[in-house]
């Protein structure tokens, strides 16, 4: 069993809103697996939902470029958000983006290799670690992009439509964070898990009900889940009366793909013991 650390309990508490003891008990029962603990807490009715997107900890910037039916998005990480706002870091990000775009790179490894000297120079100057983490390249009849500050970036490709529509949809993706393009893209495994959680949460409600009624209840929950997870089924942020897929169709367009980056998603950042850090600094001044 994985060690149940204070950091793990804290993360589960932040992601579920439950008390510290409840979170610790759930982690112990789940053998230290935080995702299983969340599923168990949902199944027991302790929580209705939890954002299961992993730890978002690293700092840095997202950058995008769209030109001539092509789009590129990259993520460059720093240790602090302060550095991400500095001109030297911004210049490194832009130069990396432009190089990758102009060389039509589709993988991050060649960019990391070619930018290593510049990266080392930046690290030496700023005193923080800097890394080019990832990139994605897209091509399409219409390509749109949206950048929310420096922390969230989106690329969208359309068949038909125009750049303004693509940008609107990209903005929606940034705000709503869909998991997949359409319901057909949701895995059977994920649907089965959602069904299992629904049955456990509603065991009392469905007890004694006819099988066809239970099936309709399950179908309703799954349809709701698919709508929440799928871009084309989500209510458009600018007009919730219209689904994103219908918005595209009305404009004579079809959404082909989307890519959404958020700074640091899935990267675990080391916990800082500020009390120990201050104590160490005080001790150092007394030497």
From Swiss-Prot:
Q: What does this protein do?
A: Associates with the EF-Tu.GDP complex and induces the exchange of GDP to GTP. It remains bound to the aminoacyl-tRNA.EF-Tu.GTP complex up to the GTP hydrolysis stage on the ribosome.
Please state the gene responsible for encoding this protein. Answer: tsf
Name under which the protein is recorded: Elongation factor Ts
Cytoplasm recorded as keyword: yes
Q: What is its main location?
A: cytoplasm
Q: What SUPFAM superfamilies does the record tag this protein with?
A: Elongation factor Ts (EF-Ts), dimerisation domain, UBA-like
Keywords from the named record: Cytoplasm, Elongation factor, Protein biosynthesis
Q: Which PANTHER family match?
A: ELONGATION FACTOR TS, ELONGATION FACTOR TS, MITOCHONDRIAL
Q: What family is this protein classified in?
A: Belongs to the EF-Ts family.
The record's GO molecular-function terms, alphabetically, read: translation elongation factor activity
Annotated Gene Ontology cellular components are: cytoplasm
Source organism (scientific name): Stutzerimonas stutzeri (strain A1501)
Positions of region (Involved in Mg(2+) ion dislocation from EF-Tu)? 80-83
InterPro entries per UniProt: EF-Ts_dimer_sf, Transl_elong_EFTs/EF1B, Transl_elong_EFTs/EF1B_dimer, Transl_elong_Ts_CS, UBA-like_sf
Which locations, inside or outside the cell, does it occupy? Answer: Cytoplasm
HAMAP family from the UniProt entry: EF_Ts (MF_00050)
Which PROSITE patterns does the protein's record reference?
EF_TS_1 (PS01126), EF_TS_2 (PS01127)
Write down the Pfam families for this protein, in alphabetical order.
Answer: EF_TS
